[in-house]
């Protein structure tokens, strides 16, 4: 006890809170300086000036992590969080959901009769232009399971890089995903548009649905079961119906799969994981009560399956970001060599070999498009470089060996569209000493030529109204984004860039018109997350132009009207 009392009475050692710049550089203790009042011993011996500066925590202003370091950090962060969330959710909800849903594995007669009664099946893999609703039966749990709230998110995780400085984040606000996130934080009106909350229930104890409601979770699949059919979630007949609906409703938006190759038996034998993810995507729209169960059966890696995981996620699915899944797919692409360029097709190639080769090539092209699209949306650097295959992809749709598919035309067209977007964005980001009017004139001219070329190719392929509208939507989105870069560059001038202002306005309005056409075709709800992001970006950009009306009114009104009309 006496020793303990002596230790309590012993005065604590007080160390200097600061060190001079010389000692900091040497990473040694600064001795004898008395917290900046005198010259330290090291500076005395070296006969140099003893300078004290305040600590600057974090990275130096203007310094950035390399893009490779950022991507690796995001991948590791997303993988760790996905694992931890999966384990905690399984332990918390598996028992309660099993008790409340004893017959999830049994087929639903209402679903079978409802789907087979509608007369629309994909004719030869082609997309029917003006499609009526499917008139599927309603399920009582489907609506509540996917209610949106202020805590859920359907947009890209564009702000997961906490290490970026405030100035970096301000510059990144020009990119669509960050622009939408900023507007959501800025005004509750935008939060209501982009992610509405449920109205509170009546009664004294009413609280927001997002704070009290937790959607039921499915139990994990039993050991040894690899896909939804073997797990008893759906039978083979239901799986075939879901595949038909996927090719009719979902594949026209992503153009990733070939109905001649990707049959139920082929996909199930080749990749249980891909089969599971396709069934999962179909269940999201046509059997939503089975959606969560299918998500838990993913146990093997496949590039196409990762792409589908980024296209159609649940409203409450925050397991990881789209960027992480695309990163996984890009790294797998390097390992398995999907981008191998085959200039001359072997003469002894069988029909199955041709379909499989085209499938590998299509997968890589779609992955390349998705990678460049994310770069445009978020401002991050792309992961896949251009190679021989990409440089020779402008006529890829013609080398199918048979009739040209409209979906393949879209894939080849989008590769060229990403070239135009990346080239223009790079010029503005690097600050090249070129007139913005010249850059814009070149970009808009290329987009006009692209539109003429690929509309002609689509006509030759026999595309429908949906395919032409789909091409137009993405062209208008690129036109809006590239012209917004020039408009932002001229924001400090007394008179804005009228050419860019006119292009931004018309592109945003026309984009929303195309989205309205999708609604009239009854296909809008089947679009991937990118469609939601692009339509939100166009609407928010029009509202931002409205906020800046007073500043733009300083320019000549007649000149503005002439440009817009």
From Swiss-Prot:
Transmembrane segments: none annotated. Residues 20-50 bind DNA. Residues 129-155 have a biased composition (Low complexity). One of its GO terms (biological process) is DNA-templated transcription. One of its GO terms (molecular function) is DNA-binding transcription factor activity, RNA polymerase II-specific. Keywords: DNA-binding, Metal-binding, Nucleus, Transcription, Transcription regulation, Zinc. Residues 203-215 have a biased composition (Polar residues). Residues 90-111 have a biased composition (Basic and acidic residues). It is found in: Nucleus. One of its GO terms (cellular component) is nucleus. InterPro entries: prtT, Transcription_factor_dom_fun, Zn2-C6_fun-type_DNA-bd_sf, Zn2Cys6_DnaBD. It comes from the Eukaryota. Residues 82-170, 195-224 are annotated as: Disordered. Coiled coil: none annotated. The keyword Hydrolase does not apply. The keyword Transcription applies. This is Protein priB. It comes from Lentinula edodes. The lineage of its organism: Eukaryota, Fungi, Dikarya, Basidiomycota, Agaricomycotina. The gene is priB.
